[in-house]
């Protein structure tokens, strides 16, 4: 049984009350101010029926109110489901219902879609902020093995799975990151990634654990981010490939304060890493996923040039193996990446079958392919064999194929990622049609059922799809 910790935000507010916690534009909160705002919001949420042990779903963009709401839920002892704002209403509703969320905390324009209270009562964050503020007693301690957050990630079967991330996962992720990247007194971490993704949300946990300032952007804009790095003296920023590419195109030389651009969301092409090297942009590659509560391997800064293209070595207290057919691979031999350690999720919510398939003697099978070099550095070859990573968003072909196959005129469907200069990869669909159907109709059909980034950017009509002897679709031959 893991030990308990004092309430993190309350403890941080007592230790460094006047240190800046969050900056978003002109809106700034110190840790003591953040604690007071979170406690007031906790009281308001309690008046809306939330209590210790409940689950709340958050459907919010990057805004100060979301930061406050996250901490308010933790003060109440409420676990959080982070909903992707890009999902369709049907996708969001499934996640709300499956997680048994009691309350949906959201904003315009989403509030109108969920007004009916199905499957949870929807409340506008502005209504919460304007509500009366009854007194509330925050929980004094947190149980490290309790689930703090739930994030849904689609599996290769196309069905969403709820990843349960414990307070221990978040704590050891933050500590392991600090042991790898170092922690400096004046560190400021810029986040322009969505807070509903683990790479964005993890910065909020690091903030209270480190006593570090988060500089929050509602969305990514290269010029605004570069201006913010200069004006706010940002030292670390989390990025994905598309963001890094746009930043590199805008600068000739690295801003003086910046010591780390933590790159996640899939491998970056060597050409981009070499461009960043020329411009002295301090790119630190990492490897991780929702199930590992952000990074589980990171390339230490001193190896960033020598091991260009590597995701580095496991973070402290974590382990990584490469396996093939149940046998550990030798250096240079390709196999499945398996991971173990205190940042690995508690499991998938209400999905024992997936848990059984994903874990073997405590090791989590990622489904990703990679290898170690002779020096023990990890190289990731593919983020799961068929996974499409588009602008940092995960797209699972099976999920898109299932929607296409639900169209009455589509007999067979296959989806794969095609290289794209802007997004890295975009989905293309390959179809066998029962009767005539045009691309515009299919696109509209998908838009009603999928997030916009999952909708195929092109539709190719073929006579048959490539399949193996077992009749399994061979997507790499599409």
Swiss-Prot record:
Domain of life of the organism encoding this protein: Bacteria
Keywords per UniProt: ATP-binding, Ligase, Menaquinone biosynthesis, Nucleotide-binding
UniProt cross-references to PROSITE patterns, sorted A to Z: AMP_BINDING (PS00455)
Gene Ontology BP terms: menaquinone biosynthetic process
Pathway per the UniProt entry: Quinol/quinone metabolism; 1,4-dihydroxy-2-naphthoate biosynthesis; 1,4-dihydroxy-2-naphthoate from chorismate: step 5/7; Quinol/quinone metabolism; menaquinone biosynthesis
Catalyzed chemical reaction(s): 2-succinylbenzoate + ATP + CoA = 2-succinylbenzoyl-CoA + AMP + diphosphate
GO molecular function, one term: o-succinylbenzoate-CoA ligase activity
Segments crossing the lipid bilayer: none
Xref: InterPro entries: AMP-bd_C, AMP-bd_C_sf, AMP-binding_CS, AMP-dep_synth/lig_dom, ANL_N_sf, ATP-dep_AMP-bd_enzyme, MenE
EC number(s) from the headed UniProt entry: 6.2.1.26
Similarity remark: Belongs to the ATP-dependent AMP-binding enzyme family. MenE subfamily.
Protein task: Converts 2-succinylbenzoate (OSB) to 2-succinylbenzoyl-CoA (OSB-CoA).
HAMAP family, alphabetized: MenE (MF_00731)
Name of this chain's protein: 2-succinylbenzoate--CoA ligase
Protein species of origin: Bacillus licheniformis (strain ATCC 14580 / DSM 13 / JCM 2505 / CCUG 7422 / NBRC 12200 / NCIMB 9375 / NCTC 10341 / NRRL NRS-1264 / Gibson 46)
Recorded name of the encoding gene: menE
